[in-house]
């Protein structure tokens, strides 16, 4: 019995390793370009910066792109932390404050219809 389990696991691991080797690596997904990137590249190409800038012209669009990606990842990170660390809202589980509930003749709560119609007692 143990030998058959061992052989089954070995076969499974072999098949998984062959499957991983047979698959060519997937190309990196291209980030869709927005009009803002094209505009910033055009400004950088035309020398839109100050003359005293020490940054090369090609670094500015890359920095802008990285900044935009960083803000996206920060926003998604906030969503994940909220989902994973969702503390229950105490007001959500607290029953509504019901003022003016009258007691019936025998100490039981009257329902809304019984209290308004006067048929409770």
Swiss-Prot record:
It is found in: Secreted. Residues 23-44, 64-82 form a propeptide. Expressed by the venom gland. GO terms for cellular component: extracellular region. Pfam families: ANP. Keywords: D-amino acid, Hypotensive agent, Ion channel, Ion transport, Neurotoxin, Potassium, Potassium channel, Potassium transport, Secreted, Signal, Sodium, Sodium channel, Sodium transport, Toxin, Transport, Vasoactive, Vasodilator. PANTHER family: C-TYPE NATRIURETIC PEPTIDE. In the C-terminal section; belongs to the natriuretic peptide family. This is C-type natriuretic peptide. The lineage of its organism: Eukaryota, Metazoa, Chordata, Craniata, Vertebrata.
